[in-house]
Amino acid sequence: MKALYTLIPAIALATLSADALAQSQEMIPPELATRFVGKDGMVCGKVEKAKYAQSSEGEPTFLYMGGMFPRHTFSARIDGANRGKFSFAPETLEGKDVCVIGKIQRDASRAEIEVSSPSSLKLATIK
């Protein structure tokens, strides 16, 4: 019976949805995201600038946070192959508060999360 009690929390954790996991994560400001490189995290802030780089290789969309491009501290990168998964143009998030969920990577001197699905982006209320 004791083994059953230790198994229940593991099952509960395994069934957590991405939304529940995101809500339980601490919000990381874009300015501090480089401290979390290599870890999964939720970076939240205002999208200062959004750009669909159609003429660049892979046709990525960038959501720049933590300052205006090119002085931003964080970017969310959506590969062109993943744009079709969105029911809206991701660049319409410019000016909105957003949380980006995923593995934080380094891009030059900045932090970046590669967004592969709409579930990795959440509108946020940041105070």
Q: Predicted regions: what is each one?
A:
Residues 1-8:
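Bacterial N-terminal signal peptides that target proteins for export
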Residues 23-127:
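OB-fold single-stranded nucleic acid-binding module
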